[in-house]
């Protein structure tokens, strides 16, 4: 990862077969994921090179991504909501967001704070975390039969209400609570964790009327458990 860093601090995530960085999303918020890995690795091992690369990645996110709120990754453009890379909302000028890249940037800022003790990184991380939390469901919509409170959507250009990534966000929220003691983050983590279990096809959820989702009926078998889940234990 460290050898692939660009001169502006970005670390590409997508490469051609010869390991040349793909031009699409070459300088994007996915840098947060790579930077977070290097920052944590530097903290655990004391590797000075990884630390320097992670700091450059953090400065790229701080100076380039945050001012424009350009939280782009592969899913924002090439998944179930395809659009051109130059797309933005005509009314607001807001670019497509995929909140996985927001989470990755949150993780990078937190790891840089833990690595350096510089509270400016933590402040930037909380700013990003607050943006990520805008995607959390803080009500249980009556027009869906499942219990959706506390779950997370995916993008600002698509219609998912709750998605499996909400279980990933639990750890990020808890770690920010541990560093800041902001109880809101812990409450949001608990709600997201509960929402993750609430979407499971298990007898407890059916008996408690939390959901009546049945694998193979309401959603495809191949969409759960890497295609290995069976009815009654699916997600």
Question: What are these language model-derived features?
Answer:
Residues 1-235:
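Glycan-recognition and catalytic cores of secretory/periplasmic carbohydrate-active enzymes
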């Amino acid at each position: 990862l460290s050898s692939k860093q660009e001169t502006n601090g970005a670390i590409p995530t997508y490469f051609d077969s010869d390991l040349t960085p793909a031009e699409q999303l070459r300088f994007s918020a996915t840098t947060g994921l790579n930077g977070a890995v290097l920052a944590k690795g530097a903290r655990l091992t004391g590797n000075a090179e990884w630390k320097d690369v992670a700091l450059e990645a953090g400065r790229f996110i701080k100076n380039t991504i945050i001012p424009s709120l350009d939280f782009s990754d592969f899913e924002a453009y090439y998944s179930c909501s395809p659009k051109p890379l130059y797309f933005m909302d005509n009314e607001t000028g807001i670019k497509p967001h995929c909140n996985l890249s927001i989470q990755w940037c949150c993780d990078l800022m937190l790891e840089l704070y833990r690595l350096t003790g510089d509270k400016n990184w933590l402040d930037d991380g909380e700013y990003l975390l607050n943006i990520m939390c805008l995607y959390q469901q803080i009500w249980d919509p009556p027009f869906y039969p499942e219990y959706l409170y506390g779950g997370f959507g995916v993008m600002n250009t698509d219609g998912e209400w709750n998605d499996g990534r909400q279980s990933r966000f639990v750890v990020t929220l808890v770690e920010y609570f541990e560093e800041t003691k902001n109880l809101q983050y812990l409450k949001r983590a608990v709600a997201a964790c509960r929402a993750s279990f609430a979407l499971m096809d298990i007898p407890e959820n059916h008996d408690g009327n939390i959901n009546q989702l049945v694998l193979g009926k309401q959603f495809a078998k191949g969409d759960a458990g890497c295609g290995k889940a069976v009815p009654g234990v699916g997600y």
